[in-house]
Each structure stands twice: as structure tokens, then as C-alpha cells.
Amino acid sequence: MDYKMDGYLDQQVPYTLANRSQGNGPLNRLLMATKRKYMDAELPPQESEDLFQDLSQLQETWLTEAQVPDSDEQFVPDFHSENSVAFHSPPVKIKKEPQSPGSDPSQSCSHKQSFSYPNGEQCLYASAYEQKRAAVAGAGGSKSSCPATPMSPMQHYSPKPTVGTRQESGYMNPPSSSQSHACHSHSYPMNPSSRFPSGSAEMCPPFASQGQALQRIDPAHASGGGGGGYHRQHSDPCLPYPPQQTFKQEYMDPLYDRAAHINGPQPQRFPPAHMMVKQEPTDYTYEPDVPGCPSMYHHNEGYSNPQHNSEGYMFENDSRVVPEKFEGEVKQEGGSVFREGAPYQRRGSLQLWQFLVALLDDPSNAHFIAWTGRGMEFKLIEPEEVARLWGIEKNRPAMNYDKLSRSLRYYYEKGIMQKVAGERYVYKFVCEPEALITLAFPDNQRPSLKAEFERYVNEEDTVPLSHLDEGVSYPPEPAATNMGPQPYSKGYMY
């Protein structure tokens, strides 16, 4: 059979005369002739007739009904052949839906526009009720002379909602007197079937174009337009947020608006009564480090009481909280100003190498420590005296040269001093004289060395009870009324 069909197109199917032949006479006659010419002789005549009749009916159905419509809707052909049950499941009727409003970018909720609202929530899903209520609203709605009248995507909200119903301008037809005025170049096409009563909280209005002027329709004005006004009968509104924002947006609290307190009463922007927005004031305070010293970061905007505005801010005198730097007390005696304590003492205690430089800088100390004249070498002529003075400076009466020499070895590792080999009690600084003086005496301030101990301490680092005299008898403490005198041998008070 294949060798007979070389002159024809691929997969030519012979056909017999079909039941539905009107409108396709030439085609059926051609197929009938082809069938008679190329029919296989091995098939029984009756079976081939039935088979070709079924194929002819399917071919006719495909040719007549499987046409791509002009719209973008996907079309599924509906097979109503009487013999199609033998090849397919029982016949199913497919309902042809009207064109979805989601295909129109100007009417789709999912089409994001680049305009912002002061408040509200963004809607990302198209309405599932527009197709179901299109027929009802188209039959019951008033025929408008301007079907492209722009509807405000913002809900007309009032702080005091009407009992039972809520009128919203996004789903209202304005009166006929204002329809001709509302038709302008910025309007987007809106099918009258999309203006319908909504009874669900999932409904969201479509967004308008960027250049469209947002119109606020007065509820009293819109409700007087006859049968064109519709109501939403649910208590959970869907406020449109700006499409370009994907973060949480909170309302501005009028307590934070300083202009409202300064310039007098102004319209306050409170959130609507049906929306609960959690507001927490910014904490401008913290626990002060110094007890009794208030924080310098107290901010008036953190309080709701308007009387704080008269007190002003506490940014003027902040040195009482944290001083810029710790400096020695400045005293003035005899017309001369000096600081109590050297600058390096402000950064910590006096170090040993600084103490030695201070001793070498004073010529009156040449009898126990002096320069040798060979660079930065110096000799401890009386090392015990130097150790004693160092003990006075550090309030360590038990200081001796052995302890002092162990402290000097620390400077060997740090590269500050070195021990001169072959000579006893001779050391040298490894830096330049100018650098040594600069580091030892910052701001050219010589330290004031201590001449005596702050208090008398014996060699055993104990403080004797020198204020108590053994020879003086002290009166005993007055005994309690229920106790006798204490049998202490001496008059010490314990």
C-alpha cells in the first residue's frame, strides 16, 4: 500500500462518504475517490466502511472546530462525534470561559506599577471572582456611557465605618453627571463586569497606571447614583500597599512629629480603627555609668508628654558624664601654673627607667648615680640608695638592689637598657639621648620624686601600733547592764 502513495503527501488517509458532508463536498468527493482507488482489498468491506466513516467524522470535526481564535485564550476542541466513545472517554462538555482580565496588564492585580501609596498593602494575586460574577454584574449593572471611567485603586476609608456596609470608591460607579468629566487620557479600560458586589476578603482592586490621578469619591456623592453603587459586606479590608515595597511599613506616629508640637495643632495621621499596628517608641536612654548622673542622650521625642519640650535637650554639658581625658589638677601658686603629676603618671605609674632618668637629670643626685661620660652609660654609685629611693617612690620599704636588678633585666629583653659587661653597677640606655628625654618626660614635664614615705613602714612591711602608748591606762568600755566588766588585762579596745 505504501508504494502506491509515493505521489501523494505523507500519511494520506482514504475516506468514505461521511454523514456530515454539507460544506465539504469537494473534499469528501476527493477523499471518496482516493478511498476507492487505494482501498486495501484484504479488509472486509463493512469494517473498512466503519473505520473510514469514523476517521472522516474526526477529520471534519478537526477542520471545522479546531481553529485558533483571534484572542489569546487556549481553545480545546469539543468532540461531539457519536462514535468517539469507542476511542475516548465519555463525552465531557468543556465550558468556554470569557477572556481572563488577568491577560490585560492594566486590569491585573499582579501587574506591578511604580507608584506609591502612603499606606496600605500590596496585592499580588488576581481576583478569582471576576469571572464568576461577570454575568451577574453585566446584567444588573447600569449601562455607563463611559465604560473606561477610572476607578480609584485606593479604598475610600473613613475612621468611622458605616454599620453593616462599607462603601469603597474602587468598586463604585459615579453618577452619570460626573462620568463624562472623569473620562480623560489617563484612564485605563475597565470592563463594566468588573464592578460588582464583593462578599469576600480575598478581593483586591486592580492597580491603575502610573500617570493616573487618584480620585477620592465622596461616599454620599457616590451612593446617590442609582443602582450603580455597590457595597462590600465584609469587615476585613484589603488595603493596597505600594507595589515596589516588600518590607513592613508602619504608620507615622504623631507623637514623633516635632512640628506638630511646635507649630500648633495639625491634622494627625492616626492608623484606622480596624488596623492594629504595633508601635514601640525608640529607646533613647540607657543606664548611666555614674550613679546620680543622668544620661546625656535623653530625647524628648521618646516621651509622649508635651511638657518635655520646655525643658530642652541635655546635650550642652556632657563633660560631667565622660570627661575628654584625665588630666592633672591645675594649681596656681605665686603666678606660676603647673600640673600636679607628670603626664606619664596620668597614663599609669612611674616606670623604673623613667625614675632612673629623673635621678640622672638632677645634678644633686650625682653622689649615688651619675653618667659615666661614655654615651648613654651610667653607674649606680650607691645602688642601695637608689633602691631605697625607688622603694619610697613605689611605697615598698623592703626594696633592695637585688630586687631592683631583677627589674632591670626586664628592660634587657625589651631593648631599653643593657648591662655593661666587665663593670659592676654600670648600665646604658640603647636609644638616643633626645629620644630618651622625650619618652621619659612627655611635654617636657619632670616628675616630682617623693622624698619620704607616705607613712612609716618597718622592714617587715608591717604597720606598728605607734598611736597606742603602752604606759597610758585607758578606761575600760562601759559594760552592759546585764554583764560585768570585761576581764581584759590591758586597756586596749577590741
UniProtKB/Swiss-Prot annotation:
Predominant location: nucleus
GO terms (BP aspect): cell differentiation; embryo development ending in birth or egg hatching; limb morphogenesis; positive regulation of DNA-templated transcription; pronephric nephron tubule epithelial cell differentiation; pronephros development; regulation of DNA-templated transcription; regulation of transcription by RNA polymerase II
Pfam families membership: Ets, ETS_PEA3_N
Biased composition (Low complexity): 176-187
Region of interest: Disordered: 82-113, 139-201
Subcellular location(s) per record: Nucleus
Entry-linked InterPro entries: Ets_dom, ETS_fam, ETS_PEA3_N, WH-like_DNA-bd_sf, WH_DNA-bd_sf
PROSITE patterns recorded: ETS_DOMAIN_1, ETS_DOMAIN_2, ETS_DOMAIN_3
DNA-binding annotation, residue ranges on this chain: 350-430
Additional note from the record: Transcriptional activation activity is enhanced by Raf1, ERK and PKA.
Induction info: By the fibroblast growth factors FGF3 and FGF8.
Cellular component aspect of the GO annotation: nucleus
UniProt PTM: Phosphorylated.
Organism whose genome encodes this protein: Danio rerio (Zebrafish)
A molecular function GO annotation: DNA-binding transcription factor activity, RNA polymerase II-specific
Family: Belongs to the ETS family.
Expressing tissues: In the embryo, expressed ubiquitously until the late blastula stage, in the marginal zone of gastrula stages, in the presumptive forebrain and hindbrain and in the trunk region of early somite stages. In later stages, also expressed in Rohon-Beard neurons, epiphysis, lateral line placodes, pectoral fin buds, developing lens and heart.
Keywords: Activator, DNA-binding, Nucleus, Phosphoprotein, Transcription, Transcription regulation
Protein name: ETS translocation variant 4
Function (record text): Transcriptional activator that binds to the (5'-CCGGA[AT]-3') motif. May control the acquisition of specific cell fates at an early stage during development of the somites and nervous system. May mediate the cellular effects of the fibroblast growth factors on embryogenesis.
Domain of life: Eukaryota
